[in-house]
Amino acid sequence: VQRGSFRHYLLYYCADYLVGTHVQPCAPDLMVHYHLAAKGIRARGKQVFLQHGVIKDEMQWLHRENLYLDLFVCGAKPEYEYIRDTYGFAPEVPRYLGLARWDNLLRAGQAPCKKMILFMPTWRGAHYPDGEAFRGTQFYQSCQALLNSPRLHKMLEQYDHTLVFYPHIEMQKHLAQFHTESARVYLADSKTHDVQQLLLDCALLITDYSSVFFDVAYLEKPELYYQFDEAEFRQYHYKQGYFDYRRDGFGPVCTTEDALLRALEQTLQNGMQMPPEYKARTAAFFPLRDTQNCARIYEAICGL
């Protein structure tokens, strides 16, 4: 069905169920139908929001006052409790069922990892400095310093690992401004690399705030949080929600390059294993960790 066609509109308004990974699932025009639905003008079908990641920050636009849903699928227990208690939906709307896409992630995640470290920082919002001004940001300077760190390069050689730098897709327009002097460090983008495959292949994840860390934790791989610009990040990005990285995170929080490299070396020395403390947090955060998420979601939709 061609998006935005008459047939698309016809099917959209006649469907019994509208199921998708984003709000206003299956809508011919997401933003138009989002605003129409907020005013009570919406399709007759049951609205099912599968989600494509775990919510951790405050997202006012997903509250009931701005969004109608019949089923709000949650991927983690604390996320479900946060949405249930603060987003204003009827008690039966949010359900902890697990993310549908994680069934395949868990199956594929049984394969051995590569000796690869994935460095994946997230974006900084639509109003972050652009062009030449980008080089003056803490994001650029911290990431560039790490990519060219002799200490990192020596570590990669010593432990026979590579590092793949894959910034958020909204930051990849700046990728040409980064450079490295090590043959073991790769600058990657969405044209040449698949995110899901990178997450499966990596032995360890370094990120700042990217929610991909939930995927890596779900696979019980070690991760490090390199939060070099916390105050600046909150200025341009979402406000913090229920998730506290130091209390709830699945790896240590590092605010300096030195602390990050010390934590990285310790993890390399330990054979790239997730420490027991963080495995326990993972188990508490994802009590449903099997390959039955799709089945649970299907049953929930049938019960609407």
Kindly label every feature range from the protein language model:
Residues 27-29, 80-83, 104, 127-128, ...:
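Short, charged/polar "capping" segments at the starts of alpha-helices
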